[in-house]
Amino acid sequence: VPTKERLYIMCVIALSPVGERVDKSTLADMWDTNPDGAGIAFIDETKTIRTYKTMDKDDFINVATATIDKYHQSSPILLHCRIATHGSVCIANTHPFNVDNHTVMAHNGIIDCVEDDPKGQISDTRMFINTWLRYLRPTWLDDPAMCEYVGDIIGWSKLAFLTTNANLRKSYYIINESDGNWIDG
């Protein structure tokens, strides 16, 4: 049974631009408030997105710290800790998720514009990717009207994307960024 405090907590995303770091204390805080799985995404030396997902706090902190140490000067780093609201607590529902071969995404909030999985196993984020995002053209992230549209349909949720798509202008994007907070960044 969730405590009253947990009822108001949503997943947490940290997207650190090149040159910025998330420290161990922040990683621990992220996990402690969102202990239902964690994931990391970064762009390696071959310009390939690499992801890592775990259900273990110490593993998350150790891998995230090593990844940040090695890649923070060359890649934005996307970190996500989940608190389950839809779907089972498992690696398959742990963010970030592949949107296509060049893009991953993490989500904060609850997405109401998709049907719930009838079996209760698939998260709202996975349902949204499978029923909406996979059908958008790969360059939609550079289209302000499309970003606004997606922002409108997800309500107060936030989406953070990391991409190596050569047809996009940037390597990361945030939908509904103005509804979130940048901390020391």
Predicted region positions:
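Glycine-rich phosphate-binding loop plus the immediately following alpha-helix
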Residues: 112-137
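Short acidic (Asp/Glu) patches
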Residues: 55-67, 79-100
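Extreme N-terminus nucleophile/cap motif
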Residues: 5-67, 77, 176-185
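Conserved catalytic micro-motifs used in adenylation/nucleotidyl-transfer and phosphoryl/amide-
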Residues: 40, 93-112, 149-185
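Fold-independent oxyanion-binding glycine-rich loops
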Residues: 15-18, 80-86, 108, 114, ...
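Short helix/loop capping segments that flank catalytic or ligand/cofactor-binding pockets
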Residues: 50, 87-89, 114-116, 170-171
